[in-house]
Amino acid sequence: MTKLRSKWLGLRSVTIFLINFSLAFAFVSAERRGKSLRLSTDETRENESSFFLKAINFLWESDQIGYRHVWPEFEFNWQIVLGTLVGFFGAAFGSVGGVGGGGIFVPMLSLIIGFDPKSATAISKCMIMGASVSTVYYNLRLRHPTLDMPIIDYDLALLIQPMLMLGISIGVAFNVIFPDWLVTVLLIVLFLGTSTKAFLKGSETWNKETIEKKEAAKRLESNGVSGTEVEYVPLPAAPSTNPGNKKKEEVSIIENVYWKELGLLVFVWIVFLALQISKQNLANCSVAYWVINLLQIPVAVGVSGYEAVALYQGRRIIASKGQGDSNFTVGQLVMYCTFGIIAGIVGGLLGLGGGFIMGPLFLELGVPPQVSSATATFAMTFSSSMSVVEYYLLKRFPVPYALYLVGVATIAAWVGQHVVRRLIAAIGRASLIIFILASMIFISAISLGGVGIVNMIGKIQRHEYMGFENLCKYGG
């Protein structure tokens, strides 16, 4: 937990910096408007040539709209064929790692098919939704690798998912406002850090699995069984409640789903969906518009708070951790919810699955890789579908392209889950999931960062506007 506390301190510093930057930006913008009124009466005061004001002029011009969508025609050509192949493998590996595959989808949509970056972000979310739905359906029957519980940890999802959806709404708005160069910088820093952490966690898990295999071989050799006949089974994180019964790997969906927790998650999704639809006929930045947006906060905080209080009081536990430390402090619970919001913001802003944040976080909590991947994907199903609704209402993607690519991602995710599950059973290494997660995050950092840098250089050469967009004037 000390590592998590250090992460929290670092996160708090970054948050304070961003808040200070936002306040300074708002102050300077207001000051600039006031100066423009005074300059209209006294033309002799024309001192806006300072470096600071030039920077503000670069970052914000209220009448500038830099975004124009680029949607190529939907027709059979080499771009579609190559994009389909790349999208298929991205969805297959992304669903296994619990990250969705957005880090592969966005560059593919931009570089190969030819969408503009923000439209690529929106279509990427559609593909993540398709892959997530397929993966969740595949996982609904599966059980925890060592404990007698579902492979999806519903209590963990109930703590994180409402805050994830709140973050998605913030991230979608930021996607409209933030310039591409800022998104690129944030992406590279965040993804390089999380991929490094995930790789280290994978190495640690690999070493533990090696020790477990050696111990199992020694025990069997002492009983007169050849070590070459050893089949690896993960050591249980907690004693089985039914030691005489062999744990089933698959059960019926009705038996395997925690319906109360699922009902609460669906309730949050429906409320958020209703709020998003109700904004459709409201003027951007009107009083009603902001009231509807702010109503999302009590819904998300209420449901996550309900689960957090139950965890704090010991009425609920994160059972997938096994018999480890199940007592949570207030600071830890607040930190986990904060990470949920950050994961949502990243997902909505970059068109990625929140699994890029949730996966490494769940692993740090001591959750097994299979459960981490399944639970992160389960939460992403709700958040990605909400993002798709929001992007659709903003008219950010062409429907025919989206339907086709959703179909590709849905099939690919099912294939990926099936193949990797058999591979893990064959080699006895669940750490394979963590290495896939780390690889997907790292590849995403390189591909998305590279695309962002190329686009940024192109805009500089064309002398295009590279500042913040105006959310209140955005019309799709």
Swiss-Prot record:
An annotated GO cellular component: membrane
Protein name as annotated: Sulfite exporter TauE/SafE family protein 3
Membrane spanning residue stretches: 8-28, 76-92, 99-115, 120-142, 151-171, 172-192, 257-277, 291-311, 339-359, 360-380, 397-417, 433-453
Subcellular location: Membrane
Topology with respect to the bilayer: Multi-pass membrane protein
Keywords per UniProt: Membrane, Transmembrane, Transmembrane helix, Transport
Species, as recorded: Arabidopsis thaliana
InterPro entries attached to this UniProt entry: TM_pro_TauE-like (IPR002781)
Annotated Pfam families: TauE
Primary location group: membrane
Lineage: Eukaryota, Viridiplantae, Streptophyta, Embryophyta, Tracheophyta
The keyword Membrane is annotated on this UniProt entry: yes
Protein family membership: Belongs to the 4-toluene sulfonate uptake permease (TSUP) (TC 2.A.102) family.
